[in-house]
């Protein structure tokens, strides 16, 4: 009798993707983050679904509807805390996933990488519109400042900003539009994630050594399903610790006040996972230049595959590139810290140096390091 999972049209797809999938035998825990992101996405969609049942996208009642969810809905506080902190866990896994891709040279699977960058941009848009929905003070002003940046685009900027606002300022129509976008973008993210997975399974997975693993592969189940389960346990533990013991530690205190268009907070900032890009935006004194730098900070990932100069794929055996990679990591942490600080010295100059270093490392120093490592590995006789 033939096995159902190998003959049934639907089960066959699942089988080839998660059970009998040939995987390199030496992939490390860094390869867990793909599955962790999938689980994070499912958690976000499920908790968001239950929140949407009780949320009202109206200027007058949005803030109180979130308070109602936390106070009156059965386990509403838990659902809301899981959704808010789940976003932080999602982006933490996302940044580690991108970092691992750069370190091990996974960007050389160009189609998978490019879809991944589009996915990252879509997720950032989803998180941004979602952040505005509780209609807290910082959420409102964050939405006003960030969407107002569109007006810097020549000719069409003002029209574009008013189209995003559905009026002449952030208002009731903006909130309704953002709620709709937040809802629909979640499913677009899910569709893009499936495309990302399809492209990955066309080429097969990379491995830490960066060499072709075709001669040494093992089935995904049970080896990597067990390995991924360990990562999932850590994810659930961290998320539950955050949601149950310190649910507001990653949020902004200003969001405990309802949005007030007549009172500007002394320091406007987005959520922590956007602070690195926000710091780059603020480091350019010119408005249009700042917007372009903000876009470039993410879109620069698209050209990384074309800047690969090393003969070896992975950084595992390339100490100079490794050093530059960890400098880049420290640089991003610095930018995240600077994004949360007020616009005054010495934070302005630190932000400008860190922003310049970010682009210099990716566009110049890392490709040069690859060429130098090639030269060092050449036989000298």
Swiss-Prot record:
Keyword flag Oxidoreductase: no
Cofactor (UniProt): heme b
Keywords: Electron transport, Heme, Iron, Membrane, Metal-binding, Mitochondrion, Mitochondrion inner membrane, Respiratory chain, Transmembrane, Transmembrane helix, Transport, Ubiquinone
GO cellular component: mitochondrial inner membrane; respiratory chain complex III
Record: residues binding a ubiquinone: 201
InterPro entries per UniProt: Cyt_b/b6_C, Cyt_b/b6_C_sf, Cyt_b/b6_N, Cytb/b6-like_sf, Cytochrome_b, Cytochrome_b_C_euk/bac, Cytochrome_b_N_euk/bac, Di-haem_cyt_TM
Family annotation (Pfam families): Cytochrom_B_C, Cytochrome_B
Segments traversing the membrane: 33-53, 77-98, 113-133, 178-198, 226-246, 288-308, 320-340, 347-367
Binding site for heme b b566: 97, 196
Subcellular location: Mitochondrion inner membrane
Cofactor remark from the record: Binds 2 heme b groups non-covalently.
Any one GO BP annotation for this protein: mitochondrial electron transport, ubiquinol to cytochrome c
Annotated residues for binding of heme b b562: 83, 182
Function: Component of the ubiquinol-cytochrome c reductase complex (complex III or cytochrome b-c1 complex) that is part of the mitochondrial respiratory chain. The b-c1 complex mediates electron transfer from ubiquinol to cytochrome c. Contributes to the generation of a proton gradient across the mitochondrial membrane that is then used for ATP synthesis.
Extra facts: Heme 1 (or BL or b562) is low-potential and absorbs at about 562 nm, and heme 2 (or BH or b566) is high-potential and absorbs at about 566 nm.
Subunit-level organization: The cytochrome bc1 complex contains 11 subunits: 3 respiratory subunits (MT-CYB, CYC1 and UQCRFS1), 2 core proteins (UQCRC1 and UQCRC2) and 6 low-molecular weight proteins (UQCRH/QCR6, UQCRB/QCR7, UQCRQ/QCR8, UQCR10/QCR9, UQCR11/QCR10 and a cleavage product of UQCRFS1). This cytochrome bc1 complex then forms a dimer.
Name of the molecule in the record: Cytochrome b
Species of origin: Antechinus swainsonii
Gene: MT-CYB
